[in-house]
Amino acid sequence: MNSRQRQLRIKVFFVLILAALITAGSIRPANCASLKFGSPSVSVLASGLQGTLGSTVGPDGALYVVEGTLGQIARVDPRTGKISTFASGLPQTLSSVGIGGPTDVVFVGRTAYVLVTLVSSDLGGNSIDGIYRVDGPNQFTIIADIGQFNLNNPPTIPFPFFVDTGVLYAMQPYRGGFLVTDGHLNRVLSVTLGGKISVVEAFDDIVPTGLTVVLGDIVFMAEAGPVPHLPQNGKIVAFRPNSSNVAEVASGASLLVDVKFGLDGRLYALSQGPGVPGAAPGSPAQPNSGALVRANLDGTFTFLVDNINLPTSLNFIGNTAYIVTLTGDVLKVNDVFHFF
């Protein structure tokens, strides 16, 4: 496929997605008519969180942010920035590893589910890598032991890996269960509420990170790319689970960590920035080099906000973007949306 054909394919793909979202009611033309123009403005909504990676918008409209260091989920009021503890008592980050514990959180209805990683016995821990259902402020039920599944089902595509239980990064609700990315074993898993686990997509060393699901079964996924996280390896791809067709949507931003659709029907992503020269796989990017980017119809990115310090996850509430950083901040970005 030549460059012109590829650009046309991407443009048609975006237009079809947008039309389908409008038809389904996820985006309404009246909402689009009220979108703001202008340069995005950034402020710190909340700070002082510890070990922050994944986040989501809960059924009450608040932000829920994982704190791996503390083994808990924080609730952040998107208007005032007030922080309260939603759930505590989850496995904490192992000091010998430096990352892990709770890494993402989602809601199915009003029930929260937490993705936990790098806490198993192979790394010196005594907990289970997998999905935990929140039954109360400090009560949980493990619904899926993903670490054991990974031990029993190692990757079949050859690439170097050294954590056999995997590094679980992000999850999204999918058909009554979940899709989970493994940024170390380079695959996407399907997990049912009953704990059944299967591999729905397997890749070579592309480092899958954040993902979003639209129209029930179309997955948009961010790729961080292997060390040294070159810009051309930072990509958004799209696929249907269990399909061999994976389409590149956009590329050109280093170490992508999350992807979301905005209210304007455009696709946005977080770039953590260039990797640190000589750093080990899994290391964060260079400080203050992250960016909020928007995917264009020609397969490139437009950089909207730069110099973000180690962003990890992205959510939209109305016309506002909320960015969680590895340093424990929640940033609020106004005036993001533009027509195309």
Predicted segments with their positions:
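Bacterial N-terminal signal peptides
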Residues: 13-24
